[in-house]
Amino acid sequence: MKNIILFFFILGSSIYQSKAQVKESYKAQIAYKIVETSPRCKQLTKGLYERIVKNGGTSYGVMLESSPNPKTDPSQGYSKTYNFNLHESYADRMPILARFVFDPKKQQLYEEDVLNDKLIAIAFDKKLLKRFNKTR
């Protein structure tokens, strides 16, 4: 009897988890790749995990904050661009290290200069644009 209850508990948990996980659209997936594979993002994340753990943190991540499709992407709001942040993860906070913007109309990746309130065009793998522009 205990095994049956345990089985249904595990089954129920896995069903709940699969419904709770939202998969972003194809375009958002490629926008993530554009950011994560950019030389600037790689520069910022080199050795970052070790430094975070040394300071009591758990990890870092890139998060989609807003997108042109907030209903299909796990983003917090609508924007004409794909807006990301690179953040550190601690038990009590998530400090943001950098913000990135991918503009699908201009086909350009930017790093946001928060102090001067401007976007700075940065290098990225242009081959990913072909995949981004592919209709699915």
Give residue spans per PLM region.
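Bacterial Sec-dependent N-terminal signal peptides
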Residues: 1-24
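Assembly/interface hotspot detector across virion components, adhesins/toxins, and nucleic-acid enzymes
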Residues: 15, 98-100, 110-112
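Short, non-transmembrane alpha-helical segments in secretory-pathway proteins
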Residues: 21-68
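Exposed beta-strand-loop-beta-strand "reactive/processing" segments of non-cytosolic proteins
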Residues: 57-102
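C-terminal partner/receptor-binding element of secreted or periplasmic proteins
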Residues: 111-136
